């Protein structure tokens, strides 16, 4: 096989993929078939080059070629004329063009490398479309049929075809003006990083380099010397165009940064910065040793005020002479007591956790920026900082510091940034209002001019919340407000809080890790949820009132698909009670009241720490939009078919699981409440198909107030008001935005729903096939078996009921109680017993009941033997009275079995049941 040729696959079968060697003395292919050129072939070749080179830039000074110098390639590319020494070549030899197809791994001659290096300096990029391969294949077909003047050969190097040396040719060549065409139709994934360029010298016709690295070969087109000809010509089919597109950083699985680019340099800078900071914190002890020296370069400042500005923490500081711990130390700073403005990044501020009156050491390399018109210098590059804490104040600092207190944020207008006097002087002043946020910082008196921010009393109030959001954007609204009515007030857990923090609260304070929320509605019907820093007792006073919202900030825009919970609450307030206003009109429209669909979006708002303000508007007609929750009885709620809707009711809690005896046991857990009311207990009012009790599931996301938590920890039954609970299949769910209250609010009440007092003892449903899990029922049956594997007994203290008694040898085997610190002479014996019952209501079912101590004592009263032990046969066949049981499990496969646990209902004077 000739040099430079490669084996072709079996799939690449074409009639013109053959070898055509030329013998010595034979005329070139171009001369023999010169008369076969047609206008159609020239036109097709011209169209192909025009498609591929639409982006070529026209160069000035390209005169038309003579008839003797027009080859196929030169005719359609309009190259520059030849040098003068070649104008005397014959017509046959001047039209000869040799395109060399070579592999990308073959070695080029020295002159090729030199010329390519010269041409790389003036490359111009032109995008090459993907159909360039198809145009190339079609051109090759026309070459075979009509364009016989082109000779195609495959060789490794054609340096021997030139009689001149490389230095002579380089001296004769003018400055090349090359064009680089990117070829993106890559056939090899391993060569994606190679350059696919087409180098065309528009000045010199000696050499034309065509490199296709994506095709794993290099194409060199040059004008051969008429005295030397190639001894063999090999025709090869170019690679077929494939559907594989180049991998870009957007669709590449492994994204790589461009070497030497800006992204790589920034990435390296960030890595070096993090490494330097980590290394400095690791070697912080060695820096402490240099504090006493005069050339340490450590800047010691005292923080006077902190605020956030443009995602940076700005600290107004006072420069100190030295460290407060060492009065003899001297700082490098020559001006003790001078005012400084220190900038901390978000990461540095999070690590430093500085507060007013804290002392901070700033280690080099810090920089000082002095602004000519500024009030004080600015300290930059504060990556290496350390807070100084005295030993006697270390414990107090840890107790006083509260990371949850947000820093005040200052929004600076563009007029203040660019000192536009026409806007800054005439713009209304904005007042800083801190609603429920503790002020952190002291007055800055070192020449710092704080901008007076005051909300004008004549702030225009709009009727549409949507108009304010669209005009003001997601930022705070310093100069605009909206009139709303507060429809609901509830608590939501904070995003970074857990339910376990609720157990730490006591008294009448709000649970920790929660925030008060207001569901507001404007005059046009748009709803919004406002997150506040108020206490719930203060926020509840706003329900049903018309208020003005000023200085709000949009946190999120939610839809029904994302947040279904808030829209289930909005649906209970729709349609509106009065006609709504149309944006842009002063008077409400009667048609809007009934023809508007329910809202599909809602804005989550928050009060700006400095600008947020909520004021009650007296005698505003928008308060008529308020719709209090409609209270229903449990009988009506069970007869409703609308699942997923909100409902409000009064009910008496007769049992809860788990039994919470202390507030310390309240954690982020689910609670099951069994409730009932008069409509389910009275025979005259209740439907026999309805249950006598109803299950209420309290989800972990439901925030419970301190009063409700104390009531759940007690043993007495309590009546609760369930506000905006979710209706589910056979139960009620208390989820987010559900409120549980002990006191009865002044709300509209349906007849029969306000009576919370039960007429007598609580009646339960009997066990049957329809009894669900997590419900309570009454059971009566005959003992048919005992679970001996789980039966055991243990002694407890007769004074305090402690079950962890110790038996000491020095007390002659007597038990001692650690809680009472005394010897227990007569301990009480407790037993654990589970029996199987034969119930008439479930004849084919295996009923297993875990008995209470009272039922066990009654069952074993006359079954004890002479030695104090009990025989199983002594309890078989005994009747068990009416037991109140909690359904723990119901299984139907492989056998029908029900697991019950005997419980004791909450009574006014009783204690919790012992299990």
Swiss-Prot record:
Pfam families: DUF4502, DUF4503. Its main location: nucleus. Residues 56-65, 86-107 have a biased composition (Polar residues). Residues 151-450 are annotated as: Necessary for interaction with RAD51. Induction: Up-regulated in vascular endothelial cells treated with IL4. GO terms for cellular component: nuclear chromosome; nucleoplasm. It comes from the Eukaryota. It is found in: Nucleus. One of its GO terms (biological process) is DNA damage response. Plays a role in DNA double-strand break (DBS) repair via homologous recombination (HR). Serves as a scaffolding protein that helps to promote the recruitment of DNA-processing enzymes like the helicase BLM and recombinase RAD51 to site of DNA damage, and hence contributes to maintain genomic integrity. Found in a complex, at least composed of BLM, RAD51 and SPIDR; the complex formation is mediated by SPIDR. Interacts (via C-terminal region) with BLM; the interaction is direct. Interacts with RAD51; the interaction is direct. Interacts (via the C-terminal region) with FIGNL1 (via N-terminal one-half region); the interaction is direct. This is DNA repair-scaffolding protein. It comes from Homo sapiens. The gene is SPIDR.
